[in-house]
A protein has these predicted regions:
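Mature N-terminal segment immediately following signal peptide/propeptide cleavage
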Residues: 32-51, 55
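Proline-rich, low-complexity linker regions of envelope-associated factors in Gram-negative bacteria
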Residues: 331-335, 395, 401-443
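Short acidic, glycine/serine/threonine-rich helix-capping segments at coil-helix boundaries
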Residues: 343-348, 356-400
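Boundary at the C-terminal end of the N-terminal hydrophobic targeting segment
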Residues: 28-30
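Catalytic glycan-binding domains that act on GlcNAc-containing polysaccharides
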Residues: 49-281, 294-299, 303-323, 327-345, ...
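N-terminal signal peptide c-region/cleavage motif recognized by signal peptidases
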Residues: 23-25
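Bacterial N-terminal signal peptides that target proteins for export
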Residues: 2-16
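A general alpha-helix detector
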Residues: 36-43, 107, 144, 351, ...
Length: 443
């Protein structure tokens, strides 16, 4: 993962961690980090990690301030969705993906036969996650995860990941020097976090190692394996861009409403290309990230399978759209709005502070817009009779600023904001998904 240029100093919760790291003298630095590392040993030992592996992996550990900073930059949530999709589904990425489809035609055919997962989706995930292996991340995974723990940035997420990473080293699938990845510990061509690797990675070529770092067959097979076990349905589309009847406000339909495609068609929601739905009995929900101002989609079960890979719906949309482009489809028919102001860190932090004041969110505001914040935004929108898209816009921020918070409100409990790809069990039509690889795509 690249370093974020010209990043602003982070001023709250995790921001103080960055400033504290920079301000501590080297002696304090080392003492605090080593005490933290030693406190991790009992859990690692209980998980079967040998002391020699633990010591070798964490010898001389110091926290990485860049990891703390990057944890606060997740483009799935802080960039307008149109801008995010333009970057991830560029003409160049489509062109390269088509070349990869041709180069690995035999491998992808065997994976389709074995796992039933569409080859275009497998390659699209590869393209979105690491730009086809050219940008897999250059941070030492052990150091990144230990930093997230020892700075308190995302300790709840990172501790089981670190222990799993140590067990991967112990098994011999990869060397410590080669175990590089993202700030969140996501690894290899298709960016598995350690716990997902341990459960779902595949040794496709039979050499005794599940090498997602340097072995493309292993990496792509692992992705197919993970999607299949996440509920992928063979032969089903991920979704369709649709046209809605004039005057119909897609924001007024809950994303949890599942109906057969034939039912949606009966009320005038049809594919933008005029073609019939391939399997009209398949159930779908209406997804309109920008309401009537942008494209609308009917998304099916396979969209939710992609959400297991990354909980951000904008990510799943990027994968689905790139897969369509690789198949020969064109750009979105309806344009994305370009007039939405990108909230600054200070504005995002203020947004969270106001949500907390209204009893919709707990914790300290840090400007990280993750699943808990998005759900709080939706709850507020519902309470005011607004269109429910969960988008923290400047207009909505101004509305919150003008409205005094209710008196004696008990804050709603929320979970720690996790990296973009980490969520909870997928129980609703577009509910947060279970944990998956956690690289934040930047390009």
């Amino acid at each position: 993962m690249r370093i974020i240029p010209n990043a602003k100093p982070l001023m709250l919760k995790t921001g103080f961690a960055v400033l504290a790291l920079l301000a501590l003298p080297a002696q304090s630095f080392a003492g605090r980090d080593q005490a933290c590392v030693e406190a991790l040993w009992p859990a690692a030992k209980a998980a079967g990690v040998k002391r020699e592996i633990f010591d070798r992996a964490l010898q001389g550990f110091t926290s990485d301030p860049e990891v703390v900073e990057q944890a606060n930059y997740q483009p799935e949530y802080v960039k307008p969705i149109g801008e995010y999709l333009d970057r991830l589904v560029s003409d160049k990425r489509v062109e390269t993906g088509k070349a990869k489809l041709a180069e690995y035609q035999a491998l992808l055919g065997s994976l389709e036969t074995r796992y039933g997962v569409d080859r275009h989706v497998i390659v699209a995930i590869w393209g979105v996650e690491s730009n086809y292996g050219t940008q897999p991340g250059d941070k030492n995974v052990i150091r990144s995860l230990a930093t997230l723990i020892c700075t308190g940035t995302k300790a709840k997420f990172a501790k089981p990941q670190l222990i799993s990473a140590l067990r991967i080293l112990q098994h011999g699938d990869v060397s410590l020097d080669a175990m590089n990845g993202s700030w969140a510990g996501a690894m290899g061509h298709t960016q598995f976090i350690p716990t997902t690797y341990s459960s779902f990675a595949v040794d496709q070529d039979g050499d005794g190692k599940r090498d997602i770092w340097g072995n493309i067959p292993d990496a792509l097979a692992s992705t197919a394996s993970y999607l299949k076990k996440s509920g992928w349905q063979t032969g089903q589309a991920w979704g369709y861009e649709v046209a809605v009847p004039k005057g119909f406000d897609p924001k007024r339909v809950s994303e949890s409403t599942l109906k057969p495609l034939s039912d949606w068609q009966r009320i005038g929601i049809v594919r933008v290309n005029g073609q019939a739905y391939a399997r009209p009995s398949d159930k779908a929900s209406l997804f309109a990230p920008e309401g009537a101002r942008g494209p609308s989609f009917l998304v099916l079960n396979n969209f939710r399978a992609i959400l297991h890979y990354n909980v951000a719906k904008s990510y799943a949309l990027a994968v689905g759209h790139l897969s369509d482009r690789l198949r020969g489809g064109g750009p979105f028919v309806h344009p994305w709005p370009t007039d939405e102001t990108h909230l600054s860190l200070e504005q995002r932090t203020e947004f969270q502070r106001l949500l907390i004041a209204h009893g919709l969110l707990t914790g300290e505001p840090d400007g990280v817009i993750g699943p808990a914040t998005l759900e709080a935004v939706k709850t507020y929108q519902r309470s005011k009779g607004l269109g429910v898209d969960g988008f923290p816009s400047l207009t909505l921020l101004k509305t919150l600023q003008k409205e005094p918070p209710p008196a004696n409100v008990a804050p709603k409990p929320t979970e720690e904001e996790q990296p973009a790809n980490v969520g909870q069990d997928n129980t609703g039509a577009l509910a947060p998904a279970s944990e998956g690889p956690t690289r934040v795509p930047e390009n």
